[in-house]
Amino acid sequence: MSMERNAKTPASEVRLQSGMTAVITGASSGIGAATADRLARAGMRLILVARRADRLEALTATIRSTGGAASMLPADLALDSERVRIFQAVERAGGADVLVNSAGLGWYGYYSDMPWATALEMIQVNVAAAVHLTSLFLPHMKSRGQGHIVIVGSIAAGIPSQGVALYSGSKAFLDAFATSLHRELRGTRLHVSVLRPGPVATEFFETSAARPASGPIPARRFAIRAERVAEAVWSVIKRPRRVVYVPGVLAVVPWIEASLGWLMDRLGPLHLRARRIRA
């Protein structure tokens, strides 16, 4: 199966070989599932990872029914042992050319109201899973002389907001982690990229609101489709870059935070306070 290419490939794009293998975490829904569909259509072999086996089975079957190549690895990314098991299974299957860390959890409300069990789960899935899997796959990619790690971050990393303290913090960590790795590996055929999407219209909002003591996330009204993020993942695999904003207009966010952060300091808590009063 040939990789999808433009008629003319810019010099900045990598030469993609037929049948490259991508591991996608959080593949049972949302950005992960949309990315699986996009990369399958581009001709990549997929190894899909998520906790919900029934969702993975359905997605794998759909991809195969359209001529794609996909296999599934149900796993709980909150557990160290499960991450090691994922890596070992991928190694036995021939290794990975691309690792897409897209698994993530959310929660909305005052951090002081956040149950520690929920906070710990978010740290394990949003941060530890991406860092641990990167530490497992990166040496393997170095031994092969090439590879690409894509981390799905969030614009929340660049504009910390009320109600998402730990989520913003987890994404800011990933942002700094990915940027540091990108600079360490500069000049090699190993790439690390971070995506900074705005709110994305997925069931993330429902699952976040359903967590203990959480509430509806107001940013949902501005959400974009998961397919736009998936297209950005494919774009950055073809043409590696350190960071990609989705949509591109969000590139102004760091400037807004630097220039108008004082306004967020004053207005930020108002929505949360109003929600608490209504409750």
Give the residues covered by each predicted segment:
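SDR active-site lid
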Residues: 184-250
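Conserved glycine-rich cofactor-binding loop
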Residues: 28-29
